């Protein structure tokens, strides 16, 4: 693994194209709508800002956005886009990297919390966010629900994407809550492979992490359109809130 983590220049150069469906306005707009509402005129902090899929349209809606990003290559792609140079980006691990000021809302989308591959790092992330939030501020995470029940009995690998030129497999290690995503893509007639490790966490575990950081669960939905979260939900959008200042009489 290089300084840019698993998202080096080779990956960054094709990221937007490979995740094109995630840039569709039908996917992006509900995310931005909710974040604008939660920002309430304040600032937003994106952890794992990437190439700006959410940050750019959020900034276009008038919300001042700052980001943290481990990959310099991904951040360079953001800065090269219209409006990207107006968004401040701190390069570093979002579990520990700090930025100036406080924020009304901080957010992690598209399973990015799983990029932190230990429970210690995930707890540190919650605490880092809490330190950056204003009193009454919110932390939003979008992440998939672990799909262990969809694994065939005795199996540890499940396909998550299959097309003519790209396919992907998730490999689970239940004992460690580890998940490695194996991506295969045909490029110029050759098969390229990228394997990225993750750590999955159940919603209840994330709630406990928030509690350790002094935040409480405010909302949990099955998606950005505020669908109910049920036993059949494949992902959740959760909002934890930092306590507002207590006035002294």
Which residue ranges define each predicted feature?
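A short acidic, Gly/Pro-enriched loop at the edge of an enzyme's catalytic core
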Residues: 97-105
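C-terminal lobe and adjacent flexible extensions of AdoMet/dcAdoMet transferase-like proteins
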Residues: 203-249
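Class I SAM-dependent methyltransferase SAM/SAH-binding core
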Residues: 51-96
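A short SAM/SAH-binding and catalytic strip from SAM-dependent methyltransferases
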Residues: 104-120
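Conserved class I S-adenosyl-L-methionine
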Residues: 1-39, 41-50
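A short glycine-rich, Lys/Arg-flanked "PGG" loop and its adjoining helix->strand segment in the class I
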Residues: 123-135
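SAM-dependent methyltransferase
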Residues: 140-211
